[in-house]
């Protein structure tokens, strides 16, 4: 089981404020937040994750980190007595109201004796010098893999495998479509598939999506396997299978991002959209080594 690194004893001699990082979102966003926690914990040993909001979070599949990666939840939970103190003195409300949008801004905004971090931190720049530790922490819990997933993984390892992930679902809702749902169009995926096919003509595409029917209708694939067996609480196994591929085509989704990032092959080719959202400001979201496919 992964253990949170023990801080240098010299770090403990300096009085530091408690740093709390709010946990929220689906699995992909939870992983970005946990990655920030691990990186910060090295320099600031009094860093904890605030899981209190996850008790009432029913979207996606709730809090999944301890189950998917067998991470030690007790090592980063806030003690119950501390939560009561925080609620009593309104620390949480005050600090969320004053939070700002970047790591630099957070470090400048000290609210003794506590600093509250609220965001998604979707960039490897937050943990660029801590990648090995992140990969170790995000080792999938093999005991929970279904027989079908195990069999498919073995089959995948016999060929030049490329994952293609298509996210639709909530992205099609009016409040999300313009900013998120209009980015990874059929044209984007077709360009990415054509690019990969030119590089790897014998490749086999493994398709993961919450709308397989749409992919079959709109994206022409030369040699495709559509993965549909991971549903509900087993959805995370799609990320595991994506990470087992040699190369990846990602959607503008944190779930998709991690599936490609956890691919351990040094020579992997990852195709990503040239923009992540229509709103912009996401230039650093994808690693520089990933191949940007133009999005109109």
Locate the predicted segments by residue.
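A short, glycine/small-residue-rich beta-strand->loop->alpha-helix junction that serves as a flexible
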Residues: 22-32, 56
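A short beta-strand-loop structural module common to alpha/beta enzyme folds
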Residues: 46-57
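Leloir-type glycosyltransferase catalytic cores
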Residues: 278-296
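Extreme N-terminal starter segment of soluble prokaryotic enzymes
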Residues: 15-20
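Short amphipathic alpha-helix
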Residues: 32-40
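Secretory-pathway luminal glycosyltransferase catalytic domains
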Residues: 59-195, 199-200
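Donor-binding and catalytic core of enzymes assembling or modifying cell-surface/extracellular glycoconjugates
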Residues: 27, 190-280
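Short polybasic linear motifs
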Residues: 5-6, 10-13
């Amino acid at each position: 089981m992964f253990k949170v690194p023990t801080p240098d004893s010299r770090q403990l001699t300096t009085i530091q404020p408690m740093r709390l990082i709010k946990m929220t979102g689906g699995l992909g966003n939870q992983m970005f937040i946990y990655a920030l926690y691990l990186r910060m914990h090295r320099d600031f040993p009094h860093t904890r994750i605030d899981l209190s909001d996850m008790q009432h979070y029913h979207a996606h599949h709730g809090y999944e980190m301890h189950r998917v990666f067998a991470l030690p939840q007790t090592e980063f939970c806030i003690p119950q007595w501390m939560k009561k103190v925080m609620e009593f003195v309104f620390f949480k409300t005050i600090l969320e109201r004053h939070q700002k949008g970047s790591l630099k801004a957070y470090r400048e905004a000290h609210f003794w004796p506590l600093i509250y971090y609220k965001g998604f931190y979707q960039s490897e720049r937050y943990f660029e010098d801590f990648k090995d530790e992140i990969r170790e922490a995000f080792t999938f819990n093999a005991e929970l893999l279904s027989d079908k997933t195990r069999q498919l993984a073995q089959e995948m390892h016999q060929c030049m495998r490329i994952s293609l992930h298509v996210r639709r679902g909530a992205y099609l809702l009016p409040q999300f479509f313009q900013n998120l749902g209009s980015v990874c169009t059929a044209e984007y995926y077709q360009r990415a598939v054509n690019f990969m096919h030119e590089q790897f003509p014998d490749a086999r595409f493994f398709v993961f999506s919450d709308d397989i029917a749409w992919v079959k209708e709109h994206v022409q694939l030369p040699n495709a396997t559509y993965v549909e067996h991971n549903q509900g609480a087993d959805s995370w196994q799609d990320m595991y299978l994506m990470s087992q591929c040699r190369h990846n085509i990602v959607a503008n989704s944190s779930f998709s991002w991690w599936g490609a990032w956890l691919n351990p092959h040094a020579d992997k080719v990852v195709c990503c959209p040239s923009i992540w959202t229509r709103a912009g400001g996401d230039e650093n979201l994808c690693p520089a080594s990933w191949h940007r496919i133009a999005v109109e």
